Amino acid sequence: MTEMTEKATTFLTSQEAPAFPADRTCPYQLPTAYSRLRDEPDALRPVTLYDGRRAWVVTKHEAARRLLADPRLSSDRLHADFPATSPRFKAFRQGSPAFIGMDPPEHGTRRRMTISEFTVKRIKGMRPDVERIVHGFIDDMLAAGPTADLVSQFALPVPSMVICHMLGVPYADHEFFQDASKRLVQAVDADSAVAARDDFERYLDGLITKLESEPGTGLLGKLVTHQLADGEIDRAELISTALLLLVAGHETTASMTSLSVITLLEHPDQHAALRADPSLVPGAVEELLRVLAIADIAGGRIATADIEIDGQLIRAGEGVIVTNSIANRDSSVFENPDRLDVHRSARHHLSFGYGVHQCLGQNLARLELEVILTVLFDRIPTLRLAVPVEQLTLRPGTTIQGVNELPVTW
């Protein structure tokens, strides 16, 4: 046994392994348990998952980048030892996996079918439509005001309508898919998650049937007309791709919108800087993405071979979780990492991941957030929380970070 192997074996089996994931008590700060992990000198720390198994959590930014780009770490969620952070992962181990849970070359083949819709040029051309949608929902809020639930009346419907237009999904069905999505990503047990996925798949199967006769101009219609008809993708694979794009296309931006509003309102100096200089908005979006890191449990991997990282050993078959909320607070990369600073250059955060699995929709998310944060505060400059931030109910650490309700007034 080498010195490194002996150290790694002893470390993994005998060291304290705190429960993971942990819940936030503040929308824009790390859980205390994560701060402790971040402040440890080692790049890897063992944690205990809900089912009692252990996995490695990556605590350093540079190590996280290296591991996310390492082909010896697999994203295969069907692997028996994949580090599931919640019972709801059972829903992703049934049926055809989405490409987020695939490895090259299959991952690249499926991703390339959709990537043309998410290029910088294509997304830039969507700005007028996004602005129109944002203004429309603000008009509705103002007409019904002077109070609102920002989640249900703005943060959720804006990205829902945007992704519906992009995919060719009828927005008239938004109440169904928003509910099914919430039940899927916030399920606390396996049966609830599987039931939500089944409901979603039945809906998408019916939608694909309609698109086969009337494909329209959306991305799903194009996939039906070309990839499905040509046999490049089967029906189950198309359904799983559609589910991924629809859920990720509205859930994440909705959560980022709500938490960004909370965070700016709780940091009046940073909010004032943005109001005084709108050119800061793109950089502020990157800083908010860094600080909020809403998908901070999305970086699960399984080692297919032994990997040495900074003198520590990940053995083949061990789970690894790159928690971007921790990596984004690495003080060797970001000075004063727990401080929100809209003047900071934060573009190298890991909130969209890194490597071949880097978020497909990041250009769209950036556009939506830039428009939302500009237009919302221009139209409602007196916007404020209707309850103290301490009274907001935060989602648990097992799901996309956010709030399900956000009372505001003006």
Curated annotation (Swiss-Prot):
Keyword flag Iron: yes
Gene3D superfamilies, per database record: Cytochrome P450
Any single Pfam family the record assigns to this protein: p450
Binding site for heme: 359
Conditions for induction: By sodium ML-236B carboxylate.
Source taxon at top rank: Bacteria
Keywords: Heme, Iron, Metal-binding, Monooxygenase, Oxidoreductase
SUPFAM superfamilies for the chain: Cytochrome P450
Metal-binding listed as a keyword: yes
Gene Ontology MF: a single term: oxidoreductase activity, acting on paired donors, with incorporation or reduction of molecular oxygen
Assembly information from the UniProt record: Monomer.
Family, per entry: Belongs to the cytochrome P450 family.
Job of this protein: Catalyzes the hydroxylation of sodium ML-236B carboxylate to pravastatin.
Protein name, UniProt field: Cytochrome P450 105A3
